[in-house]
A protein has these predicted regions:
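Short amphipathic alpha-helical face segments that pack within enzyme cores
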Residues: 83-89, 206-213
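A generic structural motif
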Residues: 198-201
Length: 251
């Protein structure tokens, strides 16, 4: 299914060019630093013909942009590199139409409770995309939560509606990296959660249940309904598999 999607994008590249899709992807912050106040933030890579030529400058025969480069890129494989924070910012952009600038510090208080340092969030940027395209993406991500394999069953235990997507990062000779990204509430987005589990397997199996529980905590904390003391999560000794590939909505 994923390669069928990739083929459609490859066929379109003959009309729109070899880097039009990359330019669109970059509108959502991928391939750029988010601006968070942390040293050595990774920029990531959204490969283009120019990037590949430069990367393989000492091996020109390897630097030629091939049809497979486009098909790999559009499904997140090949030379694509992204961070969980970049994905969170990108999902926020889809949800709200604005890319936030993440920050760690809100304020510092002294021993008397007085605020001595305060930071206002930096103004985000708006991706240069059509509103209709955002609606298509929102609907597709909502469809994953409603229609993809076992995800709807897992999500029914929570009182919120979300938009989400699973993923599995592949690395040769290693188990897959389990990915899951989501935003909620769907009709009034306030929170984004991205979860990555190193060599955790499929995103729907390992990352999705954790992200969904974190999202539930965020929403309850925000509306003041969280109760009880923080729970200590016991060691995970069993993995419950949810049927589905994460490709439930591909239209």
């Amino acid at each position: 299914m994923f390669y069928e999607i990739a083929k459609n994008f490859y066929d379109a590249s003959s009309k729109i060019g070899d880097d039009a899709m990359q330019n669109y992807i970059k509108e959502f912050g991928l391939g750029s630093k988010t601006g968070i106040e942390l040293p050595d933030e990774a920029q990531g890579v959204i490969p283009t013909p120019e990037w590949k030529k430069e990367y393989f400058r000492n091996a020109p025969e390897e630097g030629q942009w091939q049809p497979g480069d486009m098909t790999n890129m559009v499904i997140g494989q090949g030379n694509v590199l992204v961070t969980p924070l970049q994905m969170a910012v990108g999902y926020a952009g889809i949800a709200t139409g604005t890319l936030p600038v993440p920050n760690l510090l809100k304020e510092v208080r002294n021993s008397s409770g007085e605020t001595v340092v305060s930071r206002e969030p930096k103004k985000g940027t708006m991706p240069d995309v059509e509103k209709a395209h955002l609606e298509i993406m929102r609907d597709a991500l909502r469809g994953v939560a409603e229609e993809d394999g076992g995800l709807p069953t897992m999500l029914k235990q929570y009182d919120y509606q979300c938009a989400c997507k699973t993923g599995t990062g592949e690395w040769a000779d290693h188990d897959g990296y389990a990915w899951f990204a989501m935003y909620a509430p769907y009709d009034n987005p306030k929170y984004v959660v991205t979860c990555v589990i190193t060599e955790g397997g499929a995103g729907a199996d390992a990352a999705a249940p954790i992200a969904a529980a974190v999202m539930d905590g965020c929403i309850k904390l925000g509306d003041g309904t969280i109760s009880g003391d923080p729970a200590v999560i016991e060691e995970v000794t069993e993995i419950i598999e949810y049927a589905g590939t994460g490709a439930g909505r591909v239209d």
